[in-house]
């Protein structure tokens, strides 16, 4: 209680004025009375805290009574963590009703006033896991007989966010339990799958493939709910969480010999950045990266306290799991490290660990108080609130850990025949190993060491030429020519950055179709081949010099070679579709390919003849051209679905999605800085393409100058910078860009309604599809 004494003495010094030589007796008595009151308040605080420590008993023997809020008068004499937080959403818990084992006696315990919302979030997460992923056995997360973990660890969470924050933490617990019971390779796979889910939102421009597993479905649902509350703060949490799972991948089970080696690793593994994201999102805080970096030296002992306390209370649970499922000869736990480092038994190691927890807790309180005195007014209030909230996290975690079944009740030894049941709690994708994926690649194919393009064929020809100059002319069994040259342009365009929207769409739709994995991969490959072919041909036909920030394929390989390669991809796509062993699938492939070319022909015709189409003509062209591949995907998946006669009709949704995708592209072409970097500024104007904004402008208010510029573009091959500015001025005058964005909003709303309808029709929620739509929202 040294801190309380100091603060009281300081307060007394501030209240009592310097006594002048002639001071009235009344004033002197009043000052003495003030000192007496302050001393009485301090003494009461000291007795309450001392009583708490002296009466400490093991938590499992303590009474499980409800949280007992104390009066405002009582609260005023108990030391608060900092002046940065004025409690709004929590009650102070009477220290005589719980036991902190003397680990953090300087810190108060608060519990959220709406703790039932935290319980609701934890239970909802467990139900979603059972429904989307698999059975849950011997699991306990945030819930406990006394306190919910989040309700005491983040007691000042904004009430509207408490349920989803607890849901997120429960999901993290479920994921963590998988890691505790699998080997390193499978653990890395689980973490990589989780990281891909976050990466698909954080870095949509990267080629990130999100799994279609049940766990990814649940992750997508969680991400959508977080983004809907506050997108910027949610993105910080997702970035922090991504950093955690990426850091965990490949880092399990190090053979640490000393605690000072282990603790920095454990702090990261515990989720220092993750907890930063949880607190800031929960409390609605915005902290700049620079400020967060400055605070690291302050918060290090806080996270060391949390890490050590977690290891202390979870020792029995982790040791049982270690003995039942040994994935290493070593444990990653502070108790284990201390026993090795100091050659002591378990009880002595626990005492040492307790001392370390107290020391690090006291050090954080000291650093925090000093920082607050020196930095107030120099740093943001949100940073100070975050540092104060960490004190609540420490006391909340210590007390909750003593009551939670997660650490105090342990599952029995697993029977051998129950191994497959444990696997049921993970996604189907979790059984895939790195070896499975590499078997299907061409990396292992050995190529000749020569540099010639016709290497193997030339070697044979040269050897025969040495024997005879006539022989090859009569030889009708010459080696087959390699496809290296014809595929090179297509491999180039395939290597360019891509958002893989079509892949994500296929994975999302398969929530409803359940197409077997092998056939699903065939459909993906066929669609990829068609898409890459159309990209190469489109860039030639539009005379576009850039594709995703790189030179277009025909700029690198020439027009003739690019056309030939694109045509070859059509043949490969047809061959791939044949592997589906379905005449109906071939008919779908041919029909949609014909429609795609009809749509493209009209787009080219309008541009070449500077003929503005009507809105209806434009939309039908989009349905044929852009929507064609989405229609093909849905129809092929419906034909290969094992749910014959029960597959949903997605024609409305795929048509709307194709329109949304194309019109979004029209809008981004004129408005997006990212699009400018990848394709050039207002490239559609250079190409003379009749996009929706241009069609709206010309039909709303016909303009001779704009039409003249389009004709001059046809002559010159592109528009100058100044001409583009003039064109944009006319679009602004007719509010065509505002109209386009408004139409995108209407379509987005209708797409969400289509998803609602299909979810009701199929009885299956589709969070992957909802997340994809969210990523594409303008």
UniProtKB/Swiss-Prot annotation:
<feature type="binding site">
    <location>
        <position position="502"/>
    </location>
    <ligand>
        <name>isopentenyl diphosphate</name>
    </ligand>
</feature>
<feature type="binding site">
    <location>
        <begin position="314"/>
        <end position="318"/>
    </location>
    <ligand>
        <name>substrate</name>
    </ligand>
</feature>
<comment type="function">
    <text>Bifunctional sesterterpene synthase that possesses both prenyl transferase and terpene cyclase activity, converting isopentenyl diphosphate and dimethylallyl diphosphate into geranylfarnesyl diphosphate (GFPP) and further converting GFPP into preasperterpenoid A.</text>
</comment>
<feature type="binding site">
    <location>
        <position position="542"/>
    </location>
    <ligand>
        <name>Mg(2+) 4</name>
    </ligand>
</feature>
<dbReference type="GO" id="GO:0016114">
    <property type="term" value="P:terpenoid biosynthetic process"/>
</dbReference>
<feature type="binding site">
    <location>
        <position position="662"/>
    </location>
    <ligand>
        <name>dimethylallyl diphosphate</name>
    </ligand>
</feature>
<feature type="short sequence motif" description="DDXXD 1">
    <location>
        <begin position="176"/>
        <end position="180"/>
    </location>
</feature>
<feature type="binding site">
    <location>
        <position position="531"/>
    </location>
    <ligand>
        <name>isopentenyl diphosphate</name>
    </ligand>
</feature>
<feature type="binding site">
    <location>
        <position position="538"/>
    </location>
    <ligand>
        <name>Mg(2+) 3</name>
    </ligand>
</feature>
<dbReference type="InterPro" id="IPR008949">
    <property type="entry name" value="Isoprenoid_synthase_dom_sf"/>
</dbReference>
<feature type="binding site">
    <location>
        <position position="176"/>
    </location>
    <ligand>
        <name>substrate</name>
    </ligand>
</feature>
<feature type="binding site">
    <location>
        <begin position="406"/>
        <end position="407"/>
    </location>
    <ligand>
        <name>substrate</name>
    </ligand>
</feature>
<feature type="binding site">
    <location>
        <position position="180"/>
    </location>
    <ligand>
        <name>Mg(2+) 2</name>
    </ligand>
</feature>
<keyword id="KW-0479">Metal-binding</keyword>
<comment type="pathway">
    <text>Secondary metabolite biosynthesis; terpenoid biosynthesis.</text>
</comment>
<feature type="short sequence motif" description="DDXXD 2">
    <location>
        <begin position="538"/>
        <end position="542"/>
    </location>
</feature>
<dbReference type="Pfam" id="PF00348">
    <property type="entry name" value="polyprenyl_synt"/>
</dbReference>
<feature type="binding site">
    <location>
        <position position="310"/>
    </location>
    <ligand>
        <name>substrate</name>
    </ligand>
</feature>
<feature type="binding site">
    <location>
        <begin position="266"/>
        <end position="269"/>
    </location>
    <ligand>
        <name>substrate</name>
    </ligand>
</feature>
<dbReference type="GO" id="GO:0004659">
    <property type="term" value="F:prenyltransferase activity"/>
</dbReference>
<protein>
    <recommendedName>
        <fullName>Preasperterpenoid A synthase PvPS</fullName>
        <ecNumber>4.2.3.-</ecNumber>
        <ecNumber>2.5.1.29</ecNumber>
        <ecNumber>2.5.1.81</ecNumber>
    </recommendedName>
</protein>
<keyword id="KW-0414">Isoprene biosynthesis</keyword>
<feature type="binding site">
    <location>
        <position position="176"/>
    </location>
    <ligand>
        <name>Mg(2+) 2</name>
    </ligand>
</feature>
<feature type="binding site">
    <location>
        <position position="626"/>
    </location>
    <ligand>
        <name>dimethylallyl diphosphate</name>
    </ligand>
</feature>
<dbReference type="GO" id="GO:0043386">
    <property type="term" value="P:mycotoxin biosynthetic process"/>
</dbReference>
<feature type="binding site">
    <location>
        <position position="180"/>
    </location>
    <ligand>
        <name>Mg(2+) 1</name>
    </ligand>
</feature>
<comment type="similarity">
    <text>In the N-terminal section; belongs to the terpene synthase family.</text>
</comment>
<feature type="binding site">
    <location>
        <position position="669"/>
    </location>
    <ligand>
        <name>dimethylallyl diphosphate</name>
    </ligand>
</feature>
<feature type="region of interest" description="Prenyltransferase">
    <location>
        <begin position="415"/>
        <end position="778"/>
    </location>
</feature>
<dbReference type="InterPro" id="IPR033749">
    <property type="entry name" value="Polyprenyl_synt_CS"/>
</dbReference>
<feature type="binding site">
    <location>
        <position position="679"/>
    </location>
    <ligand>
        <name>dimethylallyl diphosphate</name>
    </ligand>
</feature>
<feature type="compositionally biased region" description="Basic and acidic residues">
    <location>
        <begin position="414"/>
        <end position="431"/>
    </location>
</feature>
<keyword id="KW-0677">Repeat</keyword>
<keyword id="KW-0808">Transferase</keyword>
<feature type="binding site">
    <location>
        <position position="689"/>
    </location>
    <ligand>
        <name>dimethylallyl diphosphate</name>
    </ligand>
</feature>
<dbReference type="Pfam" id="PF19086">
    <property type="entry name" value="Terpene_syn_C_2"/>
</dbReference>
<feature type="binding site">
    <location>
        <position position="625"/>
    </location>
    <ligand>
        <name>dimethylallyl diphosphate</name>
    </ligand>
</feature>
<dbReference type="GO" id="GO:0016829">
    <property type="term" value="F:lyase activity"/>
</dbReference>
<dbReference type="InterPro" id="IPR000092">
    <property type="entry name" value="Polyprenyl_synt"/>
</dbReference>
<feature type="binding site">
    <location>
        <position position="542"/>
    </location>
    <ligand>
        <name>Mg(2+) 3</name>
    </ligand>
</feature>
<feature type="region of interest" description="Disordered">
    <location>
        <begin position="416"/>
        <end position="454"/>
    </location>
</feature>
<dbReference type="GO" id="GO:0046165">
    <property type="term" value="P:alcohol biosynthetic process"/>
</dbReference>
């Amino acid at each position: 209680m040294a801190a309380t004494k100091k603060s009281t003495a300081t307060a007394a010094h501030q209240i009592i004025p310097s006594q002048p030589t002639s001071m009235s007796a009344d004033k002197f008595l009043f000052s003495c009375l003030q000192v007496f009151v302050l001393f009485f308040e301090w003494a009461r605080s000291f007795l309450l805290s001392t009583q708490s420590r002296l009466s400490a008993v093991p938590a499992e023997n303590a009474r499980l009574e409800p949280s007992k809020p104390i009066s405002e008068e009582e609260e005023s004499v108990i030391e608060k963590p900092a002046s940065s937080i004025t409690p709004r959403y929590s009650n102070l818990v009477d220290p005589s009703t719980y036991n902190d084992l003397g680990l953090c006696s300087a810190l108060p315990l608060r519990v959220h006033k709406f703790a039932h919302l935290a319980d609701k979030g934890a239970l909802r997460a467990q139900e979603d896991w059972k429904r989307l992923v698999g059975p849950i056995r011997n699991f306990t997360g945030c819930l406990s007989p006394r306190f919910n973990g989040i309700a005491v660890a983040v007691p000042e969470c904004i009430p509207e966010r408490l349920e989803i924050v607890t849901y997120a933490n429960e999901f993290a617990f479920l994921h963590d339990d998988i890691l505790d019971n699998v080997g390193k390779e499978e653990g890395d796979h689980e973490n990589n799958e989780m990281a891909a889910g976050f990466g698909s939102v954080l870095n949509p421009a990267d080629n990130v493939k999100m799994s279609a597993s049940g766990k990814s479905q649940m992750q997508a649902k969680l991400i959508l709910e977080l983004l809907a509350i506050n997108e910027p703060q949610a993105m910080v949490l997702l970035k922090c969480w991504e950093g955690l799972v990426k850091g965990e991948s490949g880092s399990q089970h190090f053979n640490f010999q000393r605690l000072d080696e282990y603790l920095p690793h454990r702090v990261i593994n515990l989720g220092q950045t993750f907890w930063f994201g949880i607190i800031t999102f929960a409390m609605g805080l915005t902290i700049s990266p620079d400020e967060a970096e400055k605070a690291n030296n302050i918060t290090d002992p806080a996270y060391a306290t949390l890490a050590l306390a977690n290891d202390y209370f979870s020792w029995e649970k982790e040791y049982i799991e270690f003995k039942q499922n040994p994935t290493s000869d070593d444990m990653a736990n502070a108790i284990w490290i201390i026993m090795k480092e100091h050659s002591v038994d378990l009880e002595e190691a626990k005492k040492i660990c307790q001392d370390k927890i107290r020391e690090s807790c006291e050090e954080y309180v000291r650093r925090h108080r000093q920082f607050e005195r020196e930095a107030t007014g120099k740093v943001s209030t949100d940073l100070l609130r975050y540092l104060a909230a960490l004190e609540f996290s420490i006391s909340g975690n210590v007390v909750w850990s003593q009551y939670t079944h997660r650490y105090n009740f342990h599952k029995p030894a697993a029977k051998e025949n129950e191994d497959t049941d444990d696997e049921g709690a993970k996604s189907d994708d979790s059984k895939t190993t790195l070896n499975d994926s590499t078997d299907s690649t061409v990396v292992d194919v050995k190529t000749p060491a020569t540099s010639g393009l016709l290497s193997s064929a030339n070697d044979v020809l040269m050897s025969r030429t040495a024997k005879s100059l006539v022989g090859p002319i009569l030889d009708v069994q010459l080696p087959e020519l390699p496809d290296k040259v014809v595929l090179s342009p297509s491999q180039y365009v395939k290597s360019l950055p891509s958002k893989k929207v079509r892949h994500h769409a296929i994975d999302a739709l398969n929530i409803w179709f359940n197409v077997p994995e092998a056939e699903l991969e065939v459909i993906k490959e066929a669609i990829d081949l068609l898409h890459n072919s159309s990209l190469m041909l489109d860039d030639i036909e539009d005379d576009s010099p850039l594709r995703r920030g790189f030179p277009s394929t025909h700029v690198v390989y020439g027009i003739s070679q690019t056309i030939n390669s694109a045509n070859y991809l059509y043949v490969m796509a047809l061959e791939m579709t044949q592997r589906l062993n379905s005449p109906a699938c071939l008919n779908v492939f041919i029909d949609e390919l014909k429609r795609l070319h009809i749509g493209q022909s009209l787009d080219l015709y309008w541009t070449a003849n500077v003929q503005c189409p009507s809105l209806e003509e434009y939309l039908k062209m989009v349905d044929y051209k852009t929507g064609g591949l989405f229609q093909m995907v849905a129809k092929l998946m419906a034909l290969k679905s094992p749910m014959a006669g029960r597959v949903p009709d997605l024609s409305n949704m795929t048509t709307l999605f194709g329109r949304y995708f194309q019109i979004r592209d029209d809008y981004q072409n004129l408005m997006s800085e990212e699009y400018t970097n990848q394709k050039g500024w207002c490239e559609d104007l250079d190409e003379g393409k009749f996009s929706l904004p241009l069609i709206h402008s010309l039909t709303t208010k016909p303009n001779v100058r704009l039409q003249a510029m389009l004709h001059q573009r046809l002559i010159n091959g592109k528009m100058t910078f100044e001409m583009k500015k003039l064109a944009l001025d006319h679009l602004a005058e007719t509010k065509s860009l505002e109209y386009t964005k408004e139409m995108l909003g209407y379509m987005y709303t209708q797409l969400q309604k289509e998803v609602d309808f299909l979810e009701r029709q199929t009885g299956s929620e589709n969070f992957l599809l909802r997340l994809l739509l969210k990523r594409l929202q303008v």
